[in-house]
Amino acid sequence: MDNTVGSLTQTERSIILGSLLGDGYLRIVQGRRNALLEVNHSLAQKDYVDWKYKMLKSLCKSLPKERKGNGGRRAYRFSTRQHEELTKLFKLFYQNGKKVIPTTLELNSIMLAIWYMDDGSKCRESDVYLNTQQFTVQDQLKCVTALAKIGVESSLNRDKQYWRIRIKKSSLPKFFADISPYVVLSMRYKMSYNPVETCLLRQKAEVTEPSLL
């Protein structure tokens, strides 16, 4: 019998969807019916994982744990219970065991913030990327379309043999204004590449993390 919980809140759903665009993944344990979400980051992002756990706590039964991976990499992770709503998302986001982008993707500011905290990077003052190299070009173009629908213009940028999404300079003010309320304290360094500006951001940031509730 599947160990499922009740319906997802809109906030929980947004965090899960943002995670699926980034580093999160869904899986169905053999012999079970419903999917679960696994959140797995480096130990250096412990505060961020703890925040995700706090926001998804009603879906979980175990606290985040440290885990040593290949090459001595230290990860920090947790998983949710199995959930029928996660199974619906699994069917949208996975084909033949590979993560894909559904044509119906619609973004909001929380999803965008989670996506950026998971897989975003900023180099210099106007080079902001979503590192979507895991997805096909066709799937990345779906993301570009979804971003445009919320007023964020972007394009594909070649990264060696792969491609990733680059936020256009003209859209950076809106992009950062949209995600800023939801970026947790420990991840605010991604909001500014300049070390002095980064320090100021950290000093001015709220002591409490955004609860989204």
Show where each model-derived region lies:
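Internal intein/HINT superfamily modules and their associated LAGLIDADG
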Residues: M1-L213
